């Protein structure tokens, strides 16, 4: 499956589609419990990760929000 991940081409070998949770695992995303996922321009609710299928040609962004400063 060929995707665009964080603006760069990416391939997940041997898969035609995955749910978002499986994609996080397949791509070895760091701290998956803290990542926000944008799929094809839409921010996803974490509760939808299992039921949402990522398909060939999709665009995925992994976003991390961090606090800090004064």
Language-model features, listed with the residues they occupy:
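Ubiquitin-like/PB1-type beta-grasp interaction modules and other compact soluble beta-rich domains
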Residues: 1-70
